[in-house]
Amino acid sequence: MFADIIGDLGKWTEADGRGTMLGGCGYLLPDGSMRGSPISWVLKERMAYLEKQEQDGYPRLAPDFIVELMSVFDDPAYLRRKMDQWIANGVQLAWLIESDPQRVTIYRAGKAAEVLENPTVVRGDGPVAGFELVMARIWG
């Protein structure tokens, strides 16, 4: 699942050219906390403003888009709070993907979370408008 998402987002990112995809990156957020996400995406223009040291370490910014994967071992309440924290710190779009049940919860700045039950495709908007994740490969 993880590798498929990284592969699809990576291909789209390269073709689109507006951003940088980062895997397993930690961020120092505006509220002072440090958060990591297995998959994140940042507009290139925002990355360009960071010092070289920050680009190689923990950037002091919130990514524009993140993807979190919920496993059977994760605490759902904790991950929902984490998603809310991402949004509160400036992430524009966040996807929480669950494999059992097959569900994607989409978080957007200034909007209520949107829950998609067993979607066939999840379409990006905002910073990743044009990105589409076909879920058949993700669900396995």
Residues covered by each model-derived region:
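Gly/Pro/Ser/Thr-rich low-complexity, intrinsically disordered segments predominantly at protein N-termini
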Residues: 1-140
